[in-house]
Amino acid sequence: MDKNTHSSGSVVQAFGNLLHVKFDSPIRQGEVARVIVGEESLLGEVIEIAGDIAKIQVFEDTRGVKFNTPVHFMGHLLEAELGPGLLSTIFDGLQNPLEKVADATGVYLERGIYLPPLDREKKWDFTPLAKPGDVLKRGDSIGFVPEGRFRHMIMVPFSHFGKITITSIA
């Protein structure tokens, strides 16, 4: 298990992209799983749990998966990243930007390829809505970033507890 792994298990049955996996510690429905096939790591999602067996739907070709293939459970649910650049990009079901995947691998989507969904290098204009002295709580808007006619609201994360006092705007 690596440092990002919450729990682990191994494949006991495979039916196409549906795997039955015996696991060793608590997991939850909807949790992200990584199926390790040689050097590749295939993404899947826990869709059902019965006792110590989880059914995992793998989102790509499961060639090479066999009895005892290791599976790592990541401790978080499948999620999509939101932000500027989302509206101007075409994605696959795992939120891989297809144009960048094609640049990296050619016209055929290779399994085990996961690219960041949003461009981390592009600079975006930020318009603050909060002012110095404002006290914000989770879910409150700090400001926005325009993308075309759409405004991406930048908010205090819902994972933040307590209040934030704005001291200055950069």
Where is each model-derived feature located?
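Peripheral, non-AAA+ core regions of ATP-driven protein-machinery
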Residues: 1-170
